[in-house]
């Protein structure tokens, strides 16, 4: 009988720790924005996102050559083969303008993420 009384509080504590370790389950999708790469250019060249909010940038390379999304300021880099799609998740950004470019076509593949 004594073992049963001890086991219940222990089970409750373990359950509570498991719930806390799992983190919040909001069930909400991240705001998502799309960037297309094609023939050494990005479309759109400016992406406006909500400031102080995590978001996802969906990348698609519609061109015939590999292309890279890179932002030194945001410390993000992703290379995509022709026809490939991927995504990058960004931590909340402070209001501002953040440059990105394609390293394979740095003169033409340029743009900005604007957090407002």
Q: Language-model segments: which ranges?
A:
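Bacterial N-terminal signal peptides
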Residues: 11-21
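Short beta-strand/loop motifs in extracellular/secreted proteins, especially
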Residues: 55, 65-67, 109
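Sec/Tat signal peptide C-region and signal peptidase I cleavage site
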Residues: 23-27
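Asparagine-centered strand-capping/turn motif at beta-strand->loop junctions
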Residues: 59-61
